[in-house]
């Protein structure tokens, strides 16, 4: 991992922004951390522990993935997602609400799920997953800030959560697999996987196939992408958080980091 570490350091060193990075090779156990305890505004990455909290409620038989959730006009919020555009009264299974929160970063779906499981249960799930520094207080797209604070994440914490998920230890082995399967369907692919060979092309020059279970987060000046890379029998957890950087440049750096991770995993296959 030393070569990968060196390449990633060279990518972020010229940046005027702040970067929090954790890369963990789950096959070798090697890990590299950079500003791993630094707190960043969570943006939509907070949706990953929210998903875990919902699966925890399902595991405890408090909810079922087949439960129908009815949409109410007063619950609609703006920003990412399609639920805000659907007819009020439309009902969708809980599994679809979770999926939309993850693969389209649907904010209305997120707030519905927060209401279902409760803030305290989400906080407890984060604690149980080893998220020592991160905080969760707020639903999304609210006009009034919470006086207790904002949703924040540290790269170390997100890395811990994803590592548990990748090893089948987040909530349960079955829940971990279901969460990974959802994240693999991600529609927002413009950061870590941007420069990877197209999974739909037959002209990849013999490069190994890859999968990425990821979740992005973005507001102006803040851009994150976190996930689990799968190449052959290799698995690597990547948490890359950034703030106070030009949006175009941060996306460019993230995509190059994703490419370097892929190249590293290809050499090890």
Predicted regions, residues:
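Conserved catalytic neighborhood of penicillin-recognizing serine enzymes
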Residues: 76-111, 151
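Beta-lactamase-like hydrolase cores
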Residues: 1-38
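Active-site SXXK
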Residues: 29, 41-69, 238
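Mid-domain, small-residue-enriched loop/turn segments at the edges of structured enzyme/sensor domains
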Residues: 15, 112-170
